[in-house]
Amino acid sequence: MIDFHAAKRFNPLPMKTYLRLILAAVFALTAAARAEEKNGLSLTVSKTVVEKNDTHGNGYYGDKLNRTQALKASIKNLSFKEMPEGEVTWAVLLKRYSYTDTLIFTGTEKLKALKPAEITELIFGGTKITGYTGYSENYKDKTEWQITVKQDGKEIIKSQSTAAFDSLAKHAVKRDNAEKPNN
């Protein structure tokens, strides 16, 4: 007679948990920064907080957000020759949690000539982010962005945070007063 209760059963739960943690880490790392490579340039863009004046609340909504968020672009020359000077054109869409219209801020930054394998970082497009945390993501301002690198008037590389950026930008209200980050 075989005793089926004596043998230990295989428990797949720890492996599933481990796999979920690995997948969550991979998605978190890829969502943190958007990277593109084209025409000998690598463009990596991430959001960065340059000023933070959040207040801890004990009221109904939780903590109140009040920060300046900007874009940080790392541009690397992947080719074996020097890249000429260029310009970085950017646009940031800001959807306020308490406002129906989407605002668009635009600007242009100079890009210095890059030697082979040289990296330069630019911080631009500062916008005020407000809202409340603790109960719902719906009470926080949201941003989307698009960045284009041009050399000699020709588009070299373009990156955006969402595929729907162009259609969202068509309906946005134009603003030219994006804040200059303090970096």
Q: What are these model-predicted stretches?
A:
Residues 67, 84-89, 137-144:
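Short coil-to-beta strand junction motifs in C2/discoidin
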Residues 75-79:
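Asparagine-centered strand-capping/turn motif at beta-strand->loop junctions
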Residues 24-33:
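Hydrophobic h-region of N-terminal signal peptides that target proteins for export
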Residues 105-161, 168:
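Short, solvent-exposed, Trp/other aromatic-anchored flexible loops in extracytoplasmic proteins
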Residues 82-98:
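Short acidic, flexible loop segments centered on an aromatic residue
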Residues 3, 10-11:
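Short, positively charged and aromatic/hydrophobic N-terminal segments
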Residues 35-70, 179:
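Low-complexity, acidic Ser/Thr/Pro/Gly-rich terminal tails and inter-domain linkers that flank the onset
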Residues 16-24:
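Sec-dependent signal peptide recognition
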